[in-house]
A protein has these predicted regions:
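Non-catalytic helical/linker scaffolds that mediate oligomerization, partner binding
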Residues: 2-344
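Active-site cores that bind ATP or allylic diphosphates and position pyrophosphate for catalysis
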Residues: 345-730
Length: 730
């Protein structure tokens, strides 16, 4: 329903090459969402007969423009059967005119007639100088070569001859692909190995009048004619990889700076490609040298960065693009007065905390030592849970318990007084006799029933409210049968407002699973996630919830799923926290979730049974944890109390965008005729998967159908019973 807006386009453009690793609808959409400005198709690895379907697939998933990058005037190894061959040093091999399968003694070059241009004595370096051969003879079938420096040679890899060879600026494949691009109304084209102005004019003749031509500078000839090429082009692209075949590596930084300066002087855009994040082809994070190189490239004045192999064949295309986006954002953000000052909020691609800042309110050592001198107010366990979540930022932007004006604003407008969307009153009820012992301006110690202090409150207001009016606006009823209303009236009509500081967390038997918002954000960032689905639950996993989780992952193309069970106060008959966590840990241990896609972390919270208000509230809590999406079940947060799914959606739609996308699911059922899961209302053959029924099966010691709950999960729960551990709150 509520789409997280695309990340703002950066002034510095990001170009991504699509290939086997990224030619997938969901990956394309993710790259689009990250702010990629141009998708590159490398025609050196694309045949004309495949191009139309490739363009169609890309355009069906994004509106981002496509750039056809030509093969150009270059020599490459042939398309071997194997991915690579090995040429042994001092061996004699044949470079064929015709296509051959490729082995240690026979291979071919591309284009096929290039061998006619070779001369005896030519030195030929292959695959970025890893192999060096020399032409020693010419025969009808091809050229005879002696291997001076042996090694592995990949198929379709770059070849350099030690003298200039005149080649057509466009191959036959290029010309066929340009015709398809023209037919498909593509507007961006890159000319590889541009050597002179005539080359640029040639590609303009074969494309649209208003085509955006990017000329690639990757040879000494191109460098010599840089001004003429730039004059005829819309932009330049420095391909540092191919350029380094003719320019010594130690001179590449100097040459890069000179090209960028010339382009700027001529008012031409200039992009930089090759080896930006080479290590991330296999590793999830870059090297420090790569990060430093990118920053210096931006300092040089580059208008854009091009990801090539990193996103085309690398193992982490989204992580690569995310890293570049973070670096660009860091470069473009306002500079600190002191560059050595570390910013409070590092660059993150995760959804921004609600209100723009993750609240952190932990008492200092000195403040903790002073709590014994404070007036003590004994409060409920749920109030202490609120203190903990306020302090760790789960309720950001709240810094404490609401005053009268803020509560009224939330109940009347679903917004805080500053206009920020917020739907849940967060109140601290205090008996009149207790409230009379302190006043506005005092600092009060908030203690549990055991007398232990867990938080402090800086009192800003003490006020009363009409509980029936509050209940009607909050829960849409004043019935004491509603558990939320009952809790409200039990606390009384006197409330205390003020900022909170956490002194100590409540004891927990599941602390090892609990993650604060800062911790969950750290984990997501460490995994390279920026699009995360949150799932909040009070129950062990069953097939219905599993279907929702996997379907949401598939439909949204999210990087990962954050399963966030609640582990604190429950109603009689609810599942205990232990069995819930055990069921999910069993799924993870047995590899039943997609590998690397799921994080399990619990939250100390409680239900308020506030229907659509609570849906939005729990969504905002997940947003603060770093989730961009949030799954809503039809029985979410106790909506069986006085609320219907339709009214929930109407309420949520009335709020507008609040920065997290909700993914709604109706009750999931299993179709016995097709063995498929889907909405329970879809077919008469659908059998609804119901939490209440699962509880009944477990209480009665009956086996649950496999289609309702996995057998391994059932076994884990039955093992708890066998250990005399209770599954339910009694």
């Amino acid at each position: 329903l509520y789409k997280v807006p695309h990340m703002e386009k950066n002034k510095i453009e990001i170009l991504c090459t699509l290939g086997p690793s990224s030619f997938d609808g969901q990956v394309i959409k993710r790259l689009d969402g990250l702010g990629v400005g141009l998708f590159r198709i490398n025609l050196s690895h694309t045949k004309a007969h495949d191009l139309a379907s490739i363009i169609e697939t890309i355009q069906s998933n994004t509106d981002v423009p496509i750039c056809l990058d030509t093969e150009g005037a270059q020599v490459r190894t042939g398309d071997f059967v194997q991915t690579q061959i090995e040429l042994k040093e001092n061996s004699i091999v044949c470079g064929h005119r015709r296509k051959v399968s490729g082995d240690a003694e026979n291979f071919n070059f591309y284009p096929k007639n290039i061998v006619d241009e070779f001369q005896i004595g030519d030195l030929i370096s292959i695959d970025f100088n890893s192999v060096l051969v020399q032409v020693t003879g010419i025969k009808e079938e091809g050229v005879i070569l002696r291997v001076i420096n042996g090694g592995l040679v990949g198929r379709n890899k770059a070849v350099t001859v030690d003298r200039d060879i005149a080649l057509s600026p466009l191959t036959e494949n290029d010309q066929a692909c340009l015709a398809i691009g023209l037919e498909r109304k593509l507007n961006h084209y890159a000319l590889s190995f541009a050597s002179c102005r005539d080359d640029v004019d040639k590609i303009r003749q074969l494309t649209r009048d208003d085509a955006f031509i990017i000329s690639k500078i990757e040879s000494l000839t191109g460098l010599a004619n840089l001004v003429d090429i730039a004059t005829a082009s819309d932009a330049l692209l420095i391909d540092r990889g191919d350029l380094s075949r003719q320019v010594p590596l130690e001179r590449i930084p100097e040459v890069q700076k000179a090209i960028i300066k010339n382009a700027k002087d001529m008012n031409r855009k200039v992009y930089v490609a090759t080896n930006l994040l080479e290590s991330m082809i296999t590793h999830p994070t870059p090297t420090r040298a790569e990060v430093n190189d990118i920053y210096n490239t931006l300092l040089d004045g580059a208008d854009g960065l091009v990801l090539a192999a990193e996103t085309a064949i690398g193992a982490h295309p989204i992580a690569c693009a995310s890293m570049v986006v973070k670096m660009v954002r860091n470069f473009e953000k306002p500079k600190l007065a002191d560059p050595l000052e570390y910013p409070f909020d590092p660059i993150s691609l995760l959804v921004e905390p609600h209100g723009g800042r993750l609240v952190q309110r932990l008492a200092s050592v000195k403040e903790c030592e002073q709590v014994t001198d404070l007036i003590q107010l004994s409060v409920s366990s749920t109030t202490l849970l609120d203190c903990e979540q306020i302090a760790y930022g789960t309720y950001s932007p709240l810094t404490g318990f609401m005053n009268h004006q803020t509560c009224e604003s939330v109940l009347e407008t679903n917004r805080l007084p500053d206009g920020t969307i917020w739907t849940m009153p967060i109140l601290l009820a205090a008996p009149e006799i207790a409230a009379n012992s302190f006043g506005v301006g005092d600092r009060v110690a908030l203690a549990g029933a055991n007398g232990k202090v867990y938080a402090t409150l800086d009192v800003s207001e003490i006020f009363t409210m009409d509980l029936e009016l509050v209940a009607q606006k909050w829960f849409n009823t004043i019935s004491r049968d509603h558990p939320g209303v009952a809790r409200l009236f039990k606390g009384g009509d006197r409330f205390v407002a003020g900022d909170v500081c956490l002194v100590e967390r409540l004891p927990s038997t599941h602390r090892h699973y609990e993650l604060t918002p800062a911790q969950s954000r750290y984990i997501f960032a460490h995994k390279g996630w920026s699009k995360v689905i949150g799932f909040y639950t009070h129950n062990p996993i069953h097939r219905g919830h599993e279907h929702m989780q996997l379907k949401a992952l598939e439909d949204t193309g999210a990087d990962g799923l954050y399963i966030n069970p609640v582990i604190r106060p429950k109603e009689c008959g609810d599942f205990m926290p232990g069995p819930i966590m055990l069921s999910y840990q069993t799924m993870l241990d047995l590899g039943l979730f997609p590998k690397g896609k799921v994080i399990l972390g619990s939250v100390a919270a409680y239900s308020r049974y506030a229907g659509p208000r609570e849906i939005v509230f729990t969504a905002l809590c997940r947003k603060n944890m770093g989730c961009s999406h949030y799954i809503i079940c039809n029985d979410h947060t106790g909506v069986e109390y006085f609320h219907a799914l339709e009214s929930n959606q109407e309420f949520i739609e009335s709020l507008g965008d609040f920065g997290i996308q909700l993914v709604f699911f109706d009750t999931v059922g299993y179709d016995t005729s097709t063995a498929c899961y889907g909405p329970a209302s879809d077919s008469v053959n659908m059998h609804a998967i119901d939490d209440t029924q699962i509880r009944a099966y477990l209480r009665d010691g009956k086996s649950i159908p496999e289609w309702m709950m996995r057998e391994v999960v059932q076994e884990s729960l039955r093992s708890e019973i066998a250990k005399n551990k209770t599954l339910f709150v009694e």
